[in-house]
Amino acid sequence: MPKSRISLVHQSSNPFSRNAALALAEVSFLNEVITTIAYNPEGAIAHTLHYLPKKMRDRLTQELGRRTWMPPERASIRSHPGREIARLALTKSGLNRRLGLAYLGSIDWVCTSLDCHVAKYHLQGLDAIYAYEDGAATSFQAAKQQGILCLYDLPILFYRLSREIQAEEAQRFPELAPALQAAQEPAWKLERKEQEIHLADHIFVPSSFIKRSLIDAEVKPDKVSVIPYGAPVDYFYPQSKPDQPFRAIFEIGRAHV
């Protein structure tokens, strides 16, 4: 019996998307990974960096290292780096703010472009597509027309509950309001999120709390599977900081209730 062919789509390399790809590859389901930048520390780009001045080389190596994604066994990686490179250049230089190009410096610009590209060029011959929030609406619509299964991974709260919580926090702490992004997302982006959960044939989440946020949005409970995240704490080693600014993480998505 032939194995299923599943392609996984995520705009960047992070632990949950990499491990989802590895899990699919282990059972020979993974066809390919589709992303923006997939850096190979042993590849040609890494070797080219050695010819740059040390300060520039170290900075680029650190930035690219965060986007390391090696292809799992018997699978390939398709990278479409153009918009992500442009976004990084605009945001790191501050040009997006100075030139009034805020949208071109946003991750939404990258996600929607990759989503459209997948819909046009990467669905042929697939049994299923595995995608993530903000990067699946267009490809899921095209996949449905071709009878392709749509699998959706939501690692954070669905926006309705997240927006409600952040709106309350913004009222309590007005000085934090600019940092609470979920309460400020545009209507077109929220509509894409709604399309994604309703087009998905099955949704995977890491906690019962996130599952509840989907059920509250009228998603049927049997359409959602909880697969808890977890990792041995001994494997965590904080990276040294090259600068002094204090950084806080606002986290509401993964607690179990």
Report each predicted region and the residues it spans.
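Membrane-proximal helix-turn-helix segments that form the acceptor-binding/catalytic region
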Residues: 115-126, 137-141, 145-146, 158, ...
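Carbohydrate-associated surface elements
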Residues: 209, 230, 242
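Short beta-strand->alpha-helix junction loop in the catalytic core
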Residues: 220, 228-237
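Conserved donor-binding/catalytic core segment of Leloir-type glycosyltransferases
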Residues: 240-256
